[in-house]
């Protein structure tokens, strides 16, 4: 199953920190192919509606939200593991991340000021290509951007997951089934 990373300008044009993070992912990917998605190659992997491409080109959709659309399209079509380009892997990526219908970073629920309450992250999402969550997210993004010219919230990806979790019992079950993992992923936040 593939690993997906996106840096629209190409890794060679990314800041050194991003280059080191991507290098760490490649080093720890085991036998999983690592696909770097860029502005120049995304169409080799997914076909997007023309209205989304136009909104990106006109500046109505920023890079982060365009990346969100790419993320759910890639996972819906191929499955695998999406890792943001700013994730640094200090060890081998565990094989069990690829073995379940759905995977995300998850820890003890808390009121951390975000809607996910540590039950999922959008910077690390994985699963099978037929995962209902990715299908619903893709369809939502397509419909939303067909009718809107701006994102209502920078983190509305999380809002959509929460609505899907509340409305579709199967999605809630997928999220609940993920074991706590990567419990030290936010430790640097506490230092700064």
Describe each model-derived feature in a short phrase.
Residues 1-67, 85-192:
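Glycosyltransferase-associated regions of secretory-pathway enzymes
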Residues 69-78:
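Small-residue hinge/turn detector
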Residues 78, 83-85:
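Active-site acidic Asp-centered loop
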């Amino acid at each position: 199953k593939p690993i997906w990373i996106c840096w629209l300008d190409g890794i060679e044009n990314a800041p050194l920190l991003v280059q080191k993070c991507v290098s760490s992912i490649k080093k720890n990917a085991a036998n999983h192919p690592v696909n770097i998605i860029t502005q120049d190659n995304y169409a080799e992997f997914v076909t997007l509606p023309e209205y989304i491409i136009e909104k990106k080109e006109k500046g109505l959709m920023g890079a982060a939200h365009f990346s969100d659309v790419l993320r759910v399209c890639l996972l819906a079509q191929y499955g695998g593991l999406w890792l943001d380009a700013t994730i640094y892997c200090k060890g081998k990526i565990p094989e069990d991340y690829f073995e379940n219908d759905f995977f995300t970073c998850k820890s003890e629920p808390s009121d951390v000021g975000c809607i996910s309450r540590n039950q999922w992250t959008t910077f690390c999402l994985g699963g099978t290509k037929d995962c209902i969550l990715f299908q619903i997210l893709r369809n939502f993004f397509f419909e939303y951007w067909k009718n809107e010219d701006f994102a209502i919230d920078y983190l509305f990806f999380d809002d959509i997951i929460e609505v899907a979790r509340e409305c579709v019992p199967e999605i809630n079950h997928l999220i609940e089934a993920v074991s706590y993992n990567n419990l030290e992923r936010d430790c640097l936040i506490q230092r700064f």
